[in-house]
Amino acid sequence: MSYQHPTDLALVPELLALAPAEGKTFLAFNHAAERADGAIPAKYRELIALGVAFTTQCAYCIDTHTRHAREAGATKQEIAEAAFVAAAVRAGGTLAHALLSLRLHDSPEK
């Protein structure tokens, strides 16, 4: 069983119609965050988006941002490095939560 299927994207209009205010706000936010005229050049913006897509495991996002990164001039080497940066940050978050767990373990219960 696959949880994400390309045909699911055909349901986007229905999702937006079911929650029009939220959908409109989300699309406006998404377009603003992914705009081409920002301080971050398009290639790096797409590599950032791709790194996030790897950690959130969004197949649709990986598909879209891989294509956009390639179109913006990103190389396979840059994509590979972005993947390892994302993996390292994700692993760092795991260790940070381990520190929290150690502190909570040693603190008196409330």
Residue ranges of model-derived segments:
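Acidic, glycine/proline-rich low-complexity segments that act as flexible tails and inter-domain linkers
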Residues: 1-46, 96-110
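Iron-sulfur (Fe-S) cluster-binding segments and ferredoxin-like electron-carrier domains
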Residues: 23-25, 63-78, 102
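Alpha-helical scaffolds flanking conserved acidic
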Residues: 42-47, 76-82
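Short, thiol/selenol-centered motifs that function as redox-active sites or metal-ligating centers
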Residues: 48, 52-64
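Charged/polar positions within long, soluble alpha-helices
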Residues: 60-63, 67, 91-94
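C-terminal structural segments of small proteins and small subunits
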Residues: 80-104
